[in-house]
Each structure stands twice: as C-alpha cells, then as structure tokens.
Amino acid sequence: MALARQATDFSHGIGANPFKGMSREQLAAIAYDDSGKFTVNERHAAWHEAYDQEQAWRVRVIAQGDLEYQGTGKQNGFFAEVLKHYKGLPAIEQAQYPDNYASKLQYWISLDFNFHANQAEGGGTSYPSVVETLLEQGPHARNGAMIAASATRDTPAAH
C-alpha cells in the first residue's frame, strides 16, 4: 500500500519515483502487468523509470558512437553496444522491435563500414542513416531520432 501511495505521489509530481534504480526486468514485470496486482500509478511509475533508464543509455551510447565515428570513421562498437543492450532487454520489450533487429545489427557489424572512406571493409553493402533507423525502433523510440539528431548536431564533427 505504501508503494502505491509513493507511485501516486510521483504521478502527481510531488514525490520521487519509488522504482528508481530497479532493474529493467523488474520494471517490465510491473509496467506490463495486467493481473491487477499493481495500480495504474505503479505501472506508470515503473514504465517511466524504464523510459528514463533507456534515455540515459541512449544519450551515453550515442556519445560513445560519435567518438568512435570521429576517431575511426566506423560504428562497429556502437552497433555491438546496441546489440548487447537489445539482448539484455526483457523479452516483452524485445518483442516490440522488428523480428530481424538483432540480425540486422549483426550484419551492420560485419560490414565493418568506414563512413569516412565511404566503403565497407567487411562484407555486404551499406544502409543509409543506420543510427536513426536503430533509434526509431523499440518501446522507447519516440525521442530516439531526436536524441540522435541533437547528439550529432552538437558535436564538432557535425559542424
């Protein structure tokens, strides 16, 4: 009952999120629960924390990917980090991505594409706007493209 009150306070903007720092697996179990065990406000607070964690991860991985791109012209580490993140998501969140998401990431890694030289140093061919494509998918994608655009716009390489 206390947790429900805290979640209600959070939903009304007068308290901290009681689920802050909880694992993605636990958050998904609450946010997507339809058994009636959790209140709407608890489910909302859990979803909000998962969203906040996802956005923090996206900001970090985009910054790392930008550094990789600036230094090497490649995005292999970025794609590998995205694939690792995807594989670590709860199954209910993975299900919200396209069926071929993991294989597409693996393919992009195998391309070993050098964006500075504009050529694949591995096998296969290139895809346009791969970062935007990736970040427009998934359960928390709404702001993904906006984050990618602001991250690349605010870097020296983008000017």
Label the model's feature ranges.
Residues 1-159:
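Type III/flagellar secretion export determinants
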